[in-house]
Structure formats: C-alpha cells, structure tokens
Design a protein with these regions (language model features):
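Short, acidic/small-residue loops that bind anionic groups at enzyme active sites
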Residues: 111-132, 151-153
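Short, charged beta->alpha transition segments
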Residues: 74-84, 109-111
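Short, Lys/Arg-enriched N-terminal segments with co-localized hydrophobic residues
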Residues: 1-6
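Short glycine-rich or small-residue beta-strand-to-loop segments that form or flank ligand, phosphate
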Residues: 90-98, 124-127, 141
C-alpha cells in the first residue's frame, strides 16, 4: 500500500499555555513560545515541565510558594518565527486568549517587524479566546488542518468560523 505524503503549506506555532505534552509539539513539529514564571525569586520558562518538573512545581505551591507569570515578548516571537520565514514558510500562530493575556500584542509587534523584512511571507495570528485544554484542542485541530494540506487561509477561515 502506498503512503500519500502531504506537504504542509504553513508552519503552526503556539504558546506553551496550550498545555499539550511536549511530545505532541515535537512529533508534530510545532514550535512553541514559552511564557515565564517566577517562583522563589527565580525565573523559569514555562517549557512544559522540562526546566521544573510538574511534580516539583505543584509541591512548591502546596508548600506555600506563590508563582507569578509574565507574557511572551516580541523578541521571543521573532526568534521563533524568523527561521520559519527564512525557510520560505508562512506562519499561523495561535495565542492564549486576549481576555487573560496581552501576549497577542507582543505577537503583533513581532509580526509587523518581521513582515517588514519578509514582505513575501504571511504571519497569521489567531486569538484562541481560550486557555489550557480548550486552547490545546484548538491547536490540535489547526495541526490536523495543516497536516491535511489546507492552506493558511483555509485553516484560518475554518478556525474562526468554528
């Protein structure tokens, strides 16, 4: 039996707050931007339990630690997207809900900076209007659309109308 290979027509990216396992992102070639959190006076990337395992994180909270968070900055987005643009790929980025974070604004600043250098490319930024598992479900659906060979415009249209 022949296996049909479908070329992806765009690159999908998201934020670590989509709360999917790191293996999901690796297996599906989805770069993610890391939010950061501060705990006990030290800053950590929210890299899905790689820098601080989840059991350690939750034990610290149970022991009284009070973490705070910071959003992704424009420079981090530029570092994530520029190699994709250089390779000739357009980008769809799905952000954490604008209702709970301003990270979409950082993404827009990065997009505008990069498109001035890569005017032939496209960067579509989609507000997930969700968080955690709801956000993750949207990323999973976008991944499926990308894998099916949908164009950036087709995928965006489907996501925004559903």
């Amino acid at each position: 039996m022949w296996k049909v290979l479908i070329m992806k027509l765009f690159s999908l990216t998201c934020c670590s707050t989509a709360d999917m396992p790191v293996d999901f992102f690796r297996q599906n070639d989805i770069p993610f931007s890391c939010f950061h959190f501060i705990m006990d006076g030290k800053e950590y990337p929210d890299d899905l339990g790689q820098s601080m395992p989840f059991d350690v994180f939750y034990k610290k909270i149970a022991d009284g630690a009070e973490p705070s968070t910071s959003q992704v900055n424009a420079e981090d987005y530029e570092k994530m997207w520029e190699p994709l643009l250089e390779s000739g790929s357009d980008v769809m980025h799905i952000t954490l809900s604008s209702g709970i974070s301003g990270t979409i604004n950082s993404a827009r600043v990065a997009r505008d900076n990069l498109l001035s250098r890569y005017p032939e490319r496209k960067i579509e930024i989609i507000d997930s209007l969700g968080a955690s598992s709801g956000y993750g479900l949207l990323v999973t659906t976008a991944c499926t659309l990308c894998d099916e060979g949908k164009t950036l415009e087709e995928a965006r249209s489907w996501i925004e109308s559903n």
